[in-house]
Amino acid sequence: MRFIVLLFICSFIYPCYVSSIGFRRISKVSLKKTKCEDGYFQCNSGECIPVDKKCDYIDHCIDGSDEDFECDHLDEKSFITCAKDQFKCKNQECIPAAKYCDMVNDCLDESDEHDGCVKHLNCTNKFLCTDGHCINKEWVCDGRNDCPDGNDEWNCKANKTSSASSCKTENYQYMCANHRCISLKVVCDKKDDCGDGSDEGPGCTQFNCSSAGCQSNCHQTPKGSVCTCKPGYKLQKDNRTCNDIDECQAYGICDQDCMNVPGSYACTCQREYYLENDKRTCKARAGEATLVFSTRTSILGMHVDSEKFFSLATNLNHAVGVAMYGDYVYWSNLEENGYNTIVKKRTYHPQAPNEVIVTTGLALITGIDVDWITKNIYFADEDNHCIGVCTNDGTYCTVLIKDTDKPTGVALLPTQGKMYWSDWGTFPHIAVAGMDGKNVRIFVNVKLEWPKSVTIDYPNERLYWVDAKSKMIESVRLDGTDRRIVLHDIIQEPFSMTVFQNKLYWSDWESNGIQTCNKFTGKDWKILIRNHNKPYSVHMDHSAIKPNIDNPCYSNPCSQLCMLNQNKGYTCGCTLDKKLNADKHTCQDVKKNQHLLIIQGRKFINYYHEFLGKPKVMTLSLQHMSQQSYNNLVNIISDPLSGQIIICHLQLSTPFLTSTTDILRYDPVHHSSEKIVTINKIFFELAFDYIGNNLYTTNTVNQSIEVINLNTKAMTAFYFKDEVPKYIALAPEESKMFVAFQKSMHSISGLTLYEMQMNGLGKRKLIREGLIGPQLPMYYDRDSKTLFVSDLLPGYIYSHSAQDTRILRSGLKSPHSLTVAGDNLFWIESQNKLYSTNFRTASVKQKTVEFDLSKLNDNMTSLPGHLTPYSRDAQYVVTLRKDDIPKHDCQKNNGNCSHVCLPSLITSFICACPPGMELSNDNRTCISHHECSKNEYKCSEHNICIQRNQLCDGIENCPNGEDETSECRIKGRCKENQFMCKNGDCIRLKDRCNSRYDCTDQSDEQNCEKPKCKSDEFQCKFTETCIPKTKMCDSNPDCDDLSDEEDCRKVECTSNEFKCNNGKCIPNTFVCDNDNDCEDGEDEAAEKCYSKIACKMPKMFKCPNGDCISDSLLCNGINDCNDGSDEVHCLSNVTTHLVNCSLNEYRCLGTDICLPKNVRCDGKNDCPQSDDEQNCTYCFENEFACDNKRCIPELWVCDKANDCGDNSDEKNCDGSKRNFIESNECDEFKCSVGTCLPYSKVCDGNRDCPDGSDETGKCQTACTVNNFCKGMCYKTPAGAVCGCQSGYRLAVDMISCEDINECELDICSQMCRNTIGSYECFCKDEFIIRNDKTSCKAVGPAMEFITVTDNDIRKMTHNLHSTTQLLFPLMGVRVSGLDVNAVSDSVYWSNDEFGTIKKLNIRTNEIVTVKIVEHPQALAVDWITGNVYVNDNSHLNTIKVCNLEKGKCATLVKIQDKMKVASVIVDSINRWLFWAEISLEADHPTSKICRTDMTGADMKIIASDLGFVRGMTIDHVKSKLYWSDDFYKTVESSNFDGSQRKVVLTLNMNHALSISIFEQSLYFLSSDNLLSSCKMYGKRSCEHVNIGANNVFRLFSILHISRQVPFANPCDAEYCDYMCVLKKENATCICSDGESIESNSTCNIKNDLKFVESINFSRNTRNISGIYSITIIVLLVSVLLLCVYYYYQKNKLKSKPASNLSCSSIHFQNPSYDRSDEIEVMLDSMASSELSPGQHEYINPINNKGMKAAENNAKKSNQCSEGKNIEEEKQDALIYFVHNSK
């Protein structure tokens, strides 16, 4: 029987091998004949078709190549859902429901017009045609047949039923007695046309027309004779005479002009058009019109008549508005960093560059138009709430309309000097004004909801608009009369509209196309253009719609802007920083002349910020400045008195505290500089007093503020005993200074900001506590009297004025170098970009990118030298200004002060003296001390007094050093447990040499033995403190002496480290890991990470994209490299052509499918894995993204109307999506109409509420009179409202503030320490804190994924260069459980069908296979002992613990009947075992999660009321258990005891198949086979993890040592007879039944007997079958060799094995414990073997199923094409096949 089984298997080897080739993808070979034009697709059969016909589900090519496999229609068909107001075509297209069965084929497959479709129609409120079709009532009797048989035009002068008022004789109508209205022609014709006979009767003969006196015609009726008129005439009130009808009054009777003639009319056309043969339609002369439209990534055009497409611009970031005139096309582009630009490009010149003409002052341009007379560009800026205009080169720009709310579209009428725009804000309307911005008035404001776009029909003088909310197109005359609806019901999701001839054209996001219809009737609707990307703006260009008129601006009468006005003249305009002179033609400065100076290394850039337009940038190079003037810049300060700047640079020396600082004055006008003083000491921060010509410096060592007078070079000082001044800013004209203090030099607490007098006197005023720093750049704006403070680490900018202190901006990345110009605050962030915001009106989120400083590095050499911690990236911005400042007494001969003149608030100024001197009686002159106070000591020379505490301080303060005599040692009287400082002070002895200064003279840290720092630590130079090396050169001083930020460019990193540009050393494993560890991202730079580096592991193939894969994955028919390179040059009987995608194409994930880039993020799934629609942004910031990818205004969310079409805007309306208008609460201020505003916009002098309710009431008195707030105070119309600074919240009394414990908000990824007003995050030993200071990064090698696919088990790294290593081939066998052991670098997996558990050591390739569990499913590994906890899903259903090396298992838990276990997990640290039990109740699953210790004792149910718990994982850092629930599609978490249970993730469509935790991010594999990760701390965001579609299926695990920290194994100290497992405190011995026994004890013999019986049975079977086995093996080998040799010769050089199903080695196995008889035969003639060289497999079965399995397999049918069958034979029969391709 066994021999038959072997022959049966062998006979199918070749068919299986051949069938495996069928997995290879076959590409069609292109048979191109001639090249098609742009916009056309070339069929393989040679013909050309429009590109939009490709992949539309209809064969247009003869050979059908336009619908071939590249279209990838595949599974998306069954998932498309159309909205309720749509009809779903058979080809899955969605069309408006009104277009179903309307006698027009709107579906591309014509499925909307199938036979019998009229049976499904409901013609309510419509006209019913004879055949059952429906048409609009407006189309009845309009002179055109709309019903198939034309019955909508029958009896048009005799409606079926009517009233007496509408059934009139003058209209050739007759009213029957039954109210039926019939034609006069059929009255008295001897036929009953009325149906009641009332149209016939005696009266038809009794009355005579001769006596009627009719002017024209007469008709007999039963009621008497009636007069009628000829066509074209109308019967008058006398019912006898006729007058001519003016047909021209009928709407739409002519395309353009109409001329009335007696009895008729004639249509005429304007000069630029001609009348077509229908005598009604006007056709434009001078060639075809061009329809231009934007599609996010490109600007496209189409010739309207020929429908030929062409491209104008491609590879754009986000094009929105578009316009075209003459030789240029213009568009607005939304840049990646969020700011808008206006770009122009020459038309019909594909190679012409894109010229950015407007770069500054734009936010969101949705509408743009060009005045073809002046060439000016007009635009609507939705986010800046304005209408603006620029010259066509962007040189001059200005704002015309400032107070509009949400402008979206703009249309120009140059012939009348007018412009129109739509506004969909709080009060939707359409407005009109002159093109110079004057005479603004509301044009339409009734029945408008979302007017999205406006356009003008110039010949007919009508304005058209499209309303995206009411889904309607309307029009009105330009005089405001005759408003009409053109089209409704069919409009879906319009964006922009234009008009030309008798057609309307609009872009529609629902169909991703351009639609068109008749502009009068709405008829002839169709989709003109279909596109992959959403179309944005549309624009029509033709000379006929842009008639020339005299240009009044032709002679350049204006110095800047010249605009048309409504008086057929012109108006001059100026940029925002200028105003018109009295001559109304020239411009003058309206503000003080000021601009910015950007300094980056040697580059000095004059940056002219004019708020709107194109900034003027000039680069200066100062050759006459010495080289060292550019080194180590530590501060740049503006001097508004002279218009110059003060430059400070550090001259480094060793030791650091002996460094000096040079102060230079730079003249930006003459580009000259001079050194004014050298400070021979180190200072922390510097500020300049332009009134007294003083430099204020903070000295952290002496805990003082030192003032240096630049006139006399003399110095005075203010000392602070208990705190250290660090940061300083001055307001000289107000005699104020702002100083940030820290508790002490070595304190880790936050900074406290105070307001003080500049003379150091008087009481201090607290401004803010709890500032984090570690840097605190400040700037005081003298105009607004506002202090701006940047808290670097949290990314806040605060503003402080007399009115309030508030957060101006948040969420910034290390904002530094603050300055102000006008109403704008400027700063630089770590991305090397200059940002600005209007500090008077800005919201907390508003900022604008002004200038990209990184572009300056393109042609620059880097600045040599050290970058100090004060100068993060050697970039500064200051405001150059020269103001008329009133003269001050200090400016007159230094106030007659002999040394220092200090501005003072009360007495104008005071004179100050250096230490050791005092003012004389004249209060001007400083003299030496003659008498010393009791707290002073008088030196014997020069009459100098010193402080008494300066005695014996180790510093010679007296000229002769008498204060430091040998007697100093005996002066002190310190206790035995104290240390005496040199100055005589006593401190605790344990504070001596603790790396912190406790003696005021710092003598406690002298002559100390240096502490020994670890190899991964850095020792501070002066304080000798040890800090982690990772904190070196991170721009945050951690050493008190700042030495960790010193000489960073000279730092040498070890061979295992990578050096960042700023000198920071990071582990090499952090390089190219997709995580920026260097502050500037240098460790992830493309030139490093995409270089041609060989794969680090042997037997790996290097893909061209940098990825590495196992050699065994080559030529397997699967695209493992993701670029197809692993499937090139493969020997096969089928030639496969893999295409290399071009730069303008997108490759679908894991395939060789190349798609045009414009299908990326087009709202439709074009790739098999839908990866082209991942990480996309479809909607603008003020819009809501529907689930169906539609975009609607946020105002429509939760307004009880289904605006999305899929009702997603009305979901979760009791939660976070509630519409703020519907809500009763606002976070801050609520306007009377319901609008919410931040307090910063309330009572600020600007009407921000639509009704102005934010500027009324008590705005003038709030917070100024009886201010009861103890924190911040906000002005409101209702009075003062108290608030708190960041880090605090209002207390219960709503007046005072209390600290927020941010740690309770789970803001840190691991551990958190709350501080007053702030918090600090820190990490466990196996992690380091990231640059964001909140998340922790695991130390060690890169994290690796262990994944299960259909074919194998793989190991993958997820970084810029992923490595995919095939660990073990599965050949179709399903893996039921998976886990890893990072300590031993092993992978474990189970298979419940064949009862196997395998362990693979990744390092040694050693494989252990055991068959000691009948049906093993879920498993978990205890990484300390190596034990495996597994669920045995046999009839007993238990959880066992197994030692694979010993081949032993013990039963720990018995599961209840009808319960199943789907997940098991262990916590080796806390010694817990968790599992989920599942049962089916009432047709739905229910689950509970149970917990025991690792011996199976102390069971507790920690969670119940669950659905189907499939996966579990543990966060060992935070001791949290996570589980996924398939039924409820959620992921939940709880503590180990079940407390604090909560839902952490809700999945909408899919459920999580497998979950894991790494670095406090939850990784989950969803049922659509996509791997994602979600942060479980802070703002919990999720992202897709791209590891390739072919690299995982159902199961994965994460391998990293930080997840399984090594611990000593307590079982090593135990001597167990059977097995050792972990227990709470240590370990314990157990027997096979799970019972615990003492160490060195023996298990109960009864327990072992069961096991022995099993062994004996196996041995008996083995003995009986031994002889037969040898015979069978010999025969089998002979037959198999012949079989293989035959097929090998048959296919020699013809193909290469491409499947994992090919045979490489045969293991003969007779199941037994006795391995001595095992025979292994290797067949080297095969292409590959299962086990790699050095790889070993050990089989340890407990039962012998061989004979029974062989008999069963002999009866099986041929299922060889399935890999699973091979594994069945491998496990259950006498032989099995193992393959490991190379």
Swiss-Prot record:
Task: Please give the positions of the paired cysteines in each disulfide bond.
Answer: 36-48, 43-61, 55-71, 82-94, 89-107, 101-117, 123-134, 129-147, 141-156, 167-181, 176-194, 188-204, 248-258, 254-267, 269-282, 932-945, 939-958, 952-968, 974-986, 981-999, 993-1008, 1013-1026, 1020-1039, 1033-1048, 1053-1065, 1060-1078, 1072-1089, 1095-1108, 1103-1121, 1115-1130, 1141-1154, 1148-1167, 1161-1176, 1179-1191, 1186-1204, 1198-1213, 1226-1236, 1231-1249, 1243-1259
**Which residues face the membrane's Extracellular side?**
19-1663
Instruction: Cite the GO molecular-function annotations of the record.
Output: calcium ion binding; cargo receptor activity; hormone binding
What CDD domains does the entry give? EGF_CA, LDLa
Q: Name one Pfam family in it.
A: FXa_inhibition
Has keyword Signal? Answer: yes
Topology in the membrane?
A: Single-pass membrane protein
* Cytoplasmic face of the membrane: 1685-1782
One biological process GO term for this chain? receptor-mediated endocytosis
> Where located?
Membrane
UniProt repeat feature LDL-receptor class B, residue ranges: 327-374, 375-416, 417-460, 461-501, 502-544, 1385-1425, 1471-1518, 1519-1561
Task: Enumerate the spans annotated as LDL-receptor class A domain.
Answer: 35-72, 81-118, 122-157, 166-205, 931-969, 973-1009, 1012-1049, 1052-1090, 1094-1131, 1140-1177, 1178-1214, 1225-1260
Look up the record and report any one GO term of the cellular component aspect.
receptor complex
Q: Where is the signal peptide?
A: 1-18
Tissue specificity as recorded in UniProt: Expressed in ovaries of reproductive females.
**Residues bearing attached sugar chains per UniProt:** 122, 159, 208, 239, 702, 859, 896, 923, 1133, 1140, 1175, 1626, 1640, 1656
Residues forming the EGF-like domain are: 208-243, 244-283, 552-588, 889-927, 1262-1298
Q: Which UniProt keywords apply?
A: Calcium, Disulfide bond, EGF-like domain, Endocytosis, Glycoprotein, Membrane, Receptor, Repeat, Signal, Transmembrane, Transmembrane helix
Write out the transmembrane intervals. Answer: 1664-1684
The protein's job, in short, is:
Involved in uptake of vitellogenin by endocytosis. Expression is regulated by the juvenile hormone analog, methoprene (in vitro).
Protein name from the UniProt record: Vitellogenin receptor
Q: Which organism is it from?
A: Solenopsis invicta (Red imported fire ant)
Q: Which gene encodes it?
A: VgR
